Amino acid sequence: MEITDVRIRKIDSEGKMKAVVSVTFDNEFVVHDIKVIESQNGLFIAMPSRKAPDGEFRDIAHPINAETRSKIQTAILDKYESICAGSTETEGNN
């Protein structure tokens, strides 16, 4: 499965969330609402989640192995860093 598009919407506020991202796979399937979060250890991604009735947050969609998570995170963070350098609000691969 190939990542064919990454669209980033930067969040210009003081919080830890820096961007909301949509990733398209094989020009056929898109996952919205992936978040770019800043922590003490640097940037990471958080997959889209929903609050369950018990108060826990559960991922709606997520990679099932570390290799795929790394591939998605690298694509998102590379794109995020490139648009931050160019200060563009929203950008995709198109």
Curated annotation (Swiss-Prot):
Keyword check for Kinase, yes or no. no
Keywords tagged on the record: Cell cycle, Cell division, Septation
Keyword set includes Cell cycle: yes
Q: Which superkingdom is the protein from?
A: Bacteria
Q: Which InterPro entries match?
A: SpoVG, SpoVG_sf
Q: Which GO terms describe its biological process?
A: division septum assembly; sporulation resulting in formation of a cellular spore
To which protein family does this belong?
A: Belongs to the SpoVG family.
Report the function annotation for this chain: Could be involved in septation.
Kindly provide the name given to this protein in its UniProt entry.
Answer: Putative septation protein SpoVG
